[in-house]
A protein has these predicted regions:
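Extreme N-terminal starter segment of soluble prokaryotic enzymes
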Residues: 1-3
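Histidine-anchored nucleotide/phosphate-binding helix
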Residues: 13-25, 189
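Secretory-pathway luminal glycosyltransferase catalytic domains
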Residues: 48-189
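A short beta-strand-loop structural module common to alpha/beta enzyme folds
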Residues: 30-42
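Short, well-ordered coil loops that connect the C-terminus of an alpha-helix to the N-terminus
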Residues: 29-30, 64
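A short, glycine/small-residue-rich beta-strand->loop->alpha-helix junction that serves as a flexible
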Residues: 5-15, 41-45
């Protein structure tokens, strides 16, 4: 069984989903899940995380996302992890140790790791997986998955207005800097 942790903003979620699709293609006879429990309200509230952006967005923005979310029972089989810090500590002490390969790839080391898609046994993947080499064999599946649904009436009117005029869009990414104690005060608009 393979589980890919999904966390971060939309771009990171798309990379992680793509990695899960690549895992599924490389291991067709094995179950592949994504772990979205970090977007759970209680987790966010307890750990006061501010890096979860708009929550889990893939299902909201793309109509062809096709991968199962790992239920807590699957996480327990692979990691003894329960989305509650206290219960996880108890589970790790009481339950038998799981023989799980835990793979964490730092976002700073954006290098391709040969063979990582074909690790045997239970594997929990945590990282951003932002290297195109992982997805070479599943390009078509990703193109089908990342299709926006048909715009609703309001958005269709906006699209028409934008295309019929000289429009400029500006995006200021200030949330990361406004809320983070590390970067506070850099962007104080």
């Amino acid at each position: 069984m393979k589980i890919v942790n999904i966390i971060g903003g939309l771009g990171n979620q798309m990379f992680q989903y793509a990695f899960a699709v690549a895992l599924k293609k490389e291991n067709p006879d094995e179950a592949v899940y994504v772990d979205t429990h970090h977007f759970n309200y209680l987790f966010v509230k307890k750990y006061k995380t501010s890096n979860l952006h708009n929550g889990y967005e893939l299902d909201k923005l793309f109509s062809n996302i096709d991968i199962e979310k790992a239920p807590i029972s699957m996480l327990m089989k692979v990691t003894n992890y329960i989305p509650n810090f206290f219960l996880s500590r108890v589970a790790r002490k009481v339950l038998p140790k799981r023989h799980t390969e835990y793979v964490a790839k730092l976002s700073e080391s954006q290098t391709y790791i040969p063979g990582i898609l074909s690790l045997a046994g239970n594997v929990y993947y945590e990282g951003y997986w932002q290297v195109a080499q992982y997805y070479i064999n599943c390009r078509e599946e990703l193109h089908r998955a990342f299709v926006h649904p048909k715009p609703n009436e309001y958005n269709a009117r906006l699209i028409k207005e934008i295309t019929n005029s000289n429009s400029v869009g500006i995006h200021v990414r200030r949330g990361n800097y406004l809320l983070s104690p590390t970067y506070s005060g850099i962007c104080n608009l």
